[in-house]
């Protein structure tokens, strides 16, 4: 008995299903939601980069851009629409294997950071931005102001 007839296109009613943007992906990839830079459009399957304010934008390969990963949701049909003064979020399958909370030893901007080898409160690794934005395996996903009276902010850091 033939289960599949090669002459049959398997479309009995309607139209052929259009191809999806993301065909297959590893289910164990790390996903993270990001706010989208105002005025930018992100679509599913698009490569995205970290903007200097911690939001994401389309990756173009321009000098200094920090590639994060591939968008798995989009701004056209977001899972959660922007509400009140809160922007639209897009989920990204990031190029990394873990997200950690590190302490900002100094004022930190979103971008490449390095651990300093010291701990904050005997628990969180301290970090600081790399010199001149040099690439590293660690990316601060949010910024932090300069610590006041020895109290550091915890910031999410993507480790590649």
Give the ranges of each region predicted by the language model.
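Glycine-anchored, exposed beta-strand/edge motif detector
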Residues: 1-160
């Amino acid at each position: 008995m033939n289960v599949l007839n090669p002459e049959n296109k398997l479309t009995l009613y309607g139209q052929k299903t259009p191809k999806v943007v993301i065909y297959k992906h590893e289910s164990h990839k790390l996903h993270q939601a990001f706010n989208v830079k105002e005025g930018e459009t992100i679509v599913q399957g698009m490569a995205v980069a970290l903007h200097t304010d911690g939001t994401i934008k389309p990756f173009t390969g321009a000098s200094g851009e920090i590639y994060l990963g591939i968008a798995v949701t989009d701004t056209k049909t977001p899972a959660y629409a922007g509400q009140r003064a809160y922007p639209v979020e897009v989920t990204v399958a990031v190029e990394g294997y873990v997200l950690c909370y590190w302490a900002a030893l100094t004022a930190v901007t979103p971008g490449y950071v390095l651990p300093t080898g010291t701990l904050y409160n005997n628990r969180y690794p301290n970090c600081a931005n790399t010199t001149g934005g040099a690439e590293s395996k660690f990316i601060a996903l949010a910024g932090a102001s300069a610590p006041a009276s020895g109290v550091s902010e915890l910031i999410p850091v993507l480790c590649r």
